[in-house]
A protein has these predicted regions:
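Active-site nucleophile and cofactor-binding loops and adjacent substrate-binding regions
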Residues: 73-81
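Flexible, glycine-rich active-site loops centered on histidine and acidic residues
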Residues: 2-17, 80-102
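A short, GP-enriched loop/loop-strand-helix hinge that lies immediately N-terminal to
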Residues: 70-74, 101-102
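Generic, well-ordered alpha-helical segments
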Residues: 50-54, 78, 85
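N-terminal beta1-alpha1-beta2 module of alpha/beta enzyme domains
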Residues: 1-72
């Protein structure tokens, strides 16, 4: 059975947001070690505790620290972006981590 993780980068009060992002990256590393198939990141805006507002940036950071796990965005809020720009971002991600970006 193939198992994946959906990470929302939930911040804890009093904890620096940089730690939350690092925790998300560390979770992806552990998921890869444990044999998970895919690591999904989410996109949320204007939420007091979910700080995952730029999935393409977090995906690049995760790709740079892992080797085999597939990395995907659980959704892109296309009304906020030019679709061509999103396609270009994911093309760059695919070049950084060939065969691992969803």
């Amino acid at each position: 059975m193939q198992i994946s993780i959906l990470e929302q980068s939930v911040s804890v009060e009093g904890k620096p947001q940089s730690n939350t992002i690092q925790d998300s990256i560390n979770l992806a590393i552990k998921a890869e070690i444990l044999g998970y198939k895919r690591f999904w990141v989410s996109e949320h805006h204007n939420h007091p505790t979910i700080i995952g507002s730029a999935p393409e940036v977090l995906m690049a950071a995760i790709a740079s620290k892992t080797e085999t796990i597939r990395i995907g965005s659980a959704g892109i809020m296309l009304p906020h972006y030019a679709p061509f720009k999103v396609a270009e971002q994911f093309r760059v991600l695919a070049a950084l981590a060939p065969g691992r970006i969803d």
